[in-house]
């Protein structure tokens, strides 16, 4: 007899009613009495468990009643309807074999565990209800991202994880070396001699795939990357991780408004896809993690995102009467408290803030005609703040070179990026979406460590 997934039993219950099935999975609970026992089994294919009825006539009944939680089993039995119970059916077992007995010190017993505790056992937390839901949603959301871009003709491209350039110009990169740290070769000037290193020059883990993606956009028109990025930023907050995943589309012949349209449609698409394909998980989040989750997500997918300039945002915040820890003035980068005030108190929906001061944005963003601002835009959402950052890219070689000089960037490190402007350059735009940020928004989880399988943060690279 073939194995039937528990997901199939729930999705096509009538098809299996009164029929014999075989399942396998892990024991979640055991409740026994003298003549029968109830065992809940989860096979990993579905958020919900299936209840198995054990009768004392089973030859190994006594052994089964003593199964520790997380014991793996194979079950054969008849599907029976349970019209007056919480679950729509149960399995009356005809045979149960123990595949692998769990130790009695299994840490995930039948009680609620804090997310903080579960982070200390990241190798086991996918077995808990909360993280089973989180990581299934993560999988669905990742698929939805690919589905959105593929259906619109975007080419998926892989950009390098090891790079010699700093896309953001912030210098917060993890440096790579194979040199003996106790005997580092030096030049005559006493500096590190990177010519003796593995790549023959300084190398780092990428902070963004954007610059590489731009090269493909100027060949394929519309492309996107979706991969890991790394920031050596010593920020020990609930919103920052040292390793995270980024979605980075780049579109040729596209202005800033084209990026805004694409990003708005993409966010709505991903949310809708998860809501439709993970109803049980989303109901769990709405009940136990964030009781206002459904209302918030419904507001996002059914509203037109507001679009205002940075200057307008500053003026609104200054006139609002709101009390902030960080003073609002033109030229500062908006803090999370400012972003949330705009989305939660003033507009009560997602907001694109555009045309930021050039001095707080990256070198590759297109300079506006005023000479003070750039064609950049961030998407701010209620409950989180910024989840997307992007811009129209600077296609004018002379303007780009001048901007790099202002920031003391070595043009030789970016020779290939500058050369793109020589061979049929065109206006183009793109953006970056931190995948974990949108997962936090969709699930209601408030800490980035709880939406990534094995979080990497300052002082912690366990598992």
UniProtKB/Swiss-Prot annotation:
Compartment list: Cytoplasm
EC number: 6.1.1.22
Domain of life: Bacteria
Disulfide bonds, paired cysteine numbers: none
Catalytic activity: tRNA(Asn) + L-asparagine + ATP = L-asparaginyl-tRNA(Asn) + AMP + diphosphate + H(+)
Gene Ontology terms describing biological process: asparaginyl-tRNA aminoacylation
Principal EC category: ligase
Chief location bin: cytoplasm
Pfam families: tRNA-synt_2, tRNA_anti-codon
Cited Gene3D superfamilies: Bira Bifunctional Protein, Domain 2, Nucleic acid-binding proteins
The entry's keywords: Aminoacyl-tRNA synthetase, ATP-binding, Cytoplasm, Ligase, Nucleotide-binding, Protein biosynthesis
GO cellular component, one term: cytoplasm
Molecular function as annotated in GO: asparagine-tRNA ligase activity; ATP binding; catalytic activity, acting on a protein; nucleic acid binding; transferase activity
Subunit description: Homodimer.
Similarity-based family: Belongs to the class-II aminoacyl-tRNA synthetase family.
Protein name: Asparagine--tRNA ligase
Lineage of the organism: Bacteria, Bacillati, Bacillota, Clostridia, Eubacteriales
């Amino acid at each position: 007899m073939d194995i039937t997934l528990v997901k199939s039993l729930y999705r096509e219950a009538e098809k299996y009613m009164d029929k014999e099935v075989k399942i396998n999975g892990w024991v979640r609970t055991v409740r026994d009495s003298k003549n029968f026992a109830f065992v809940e089994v989860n096979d990993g294919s579905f958020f919900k468990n299936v209840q198995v009825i054990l009768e004392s006539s089973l030859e190994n009944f006594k052994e089964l009643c003593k199964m520790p939680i997380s014991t793996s089993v194979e079950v054969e039995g008849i599907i029976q309807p349970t019209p007056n119970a919480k679950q729509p059916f149960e399995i009356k077992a005809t045979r149960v074999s123990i595949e692998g007995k769990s130790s009695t010190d299994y840490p995930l017993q039948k009680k609620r565990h804090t997310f903080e505790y579960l982070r200390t056992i990241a190798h086991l937390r996918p077995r808990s209800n909360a993280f089973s839901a989180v990581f299934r949603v993560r999988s669905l959301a990742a698929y939805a991202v690919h589905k959105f871009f593929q259906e619109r003709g975007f080419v998926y491209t892989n950009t390098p994880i090891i790079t010699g350039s700093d896309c953001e110009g912030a210098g917060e990169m993890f440096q790579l070396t194979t040199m003996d740290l106790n005997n580092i070769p030096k030049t005559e000037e006493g500096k590190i001699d990177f010519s003796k290193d593995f790549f023959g020059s300084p190398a780092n883990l990428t902070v963004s795939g954007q610059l590489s993606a731009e090269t493909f956009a100027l060949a394929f028109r519309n492309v996107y990357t979706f991969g890991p990025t790394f920031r050596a930023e010593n920020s020990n907050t609930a919103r920052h991780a040292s390793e995270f995943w980024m979605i980075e589309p780049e579109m040729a012949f596209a202005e800033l408004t084209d990026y805004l349209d694409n990003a708005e449609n993409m966010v709505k698409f991903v949310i809708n896809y998860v809501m439709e394909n993970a109803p049980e998980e989303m109901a769990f989040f709405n009940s136990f993690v964030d009781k206002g989750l459904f209302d918030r997500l419904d507001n996002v997918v059914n509203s037109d995102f507001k679009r205002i300039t940075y200057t307008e945002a500053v003026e609104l915040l200054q006139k609002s009467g709101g009390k902030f820890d960080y003073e609002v003035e033109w030229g500062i980068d908006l803090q999370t408290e400012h972003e949330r005030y705009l989305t939660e108190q003033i507009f009560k929906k997602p907001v694109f803030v555009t045309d930021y001061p050039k001095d707080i944005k990256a070198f590759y963003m297109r300079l506006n005609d005023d000479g003070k601002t750039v064609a950049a835009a961030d998407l701010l959402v209620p409950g989180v703040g910024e989840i997307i950052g992007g811009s129209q890219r600077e296609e004018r070689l002379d303007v780009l070179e001048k901007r790099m000089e202002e920031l003391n960037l070595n043009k030789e490190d970016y020779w290939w990026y500058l050369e793109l402007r020589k061979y049929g350059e065109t206006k183009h735009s793109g953006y970056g979406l931190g995948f974990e940020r949108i997962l936090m928004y969709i699930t209601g989880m408030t800490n980035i460590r709880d939406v990534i399988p094995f979080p990497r943060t300052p002082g912690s690279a366990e598992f």
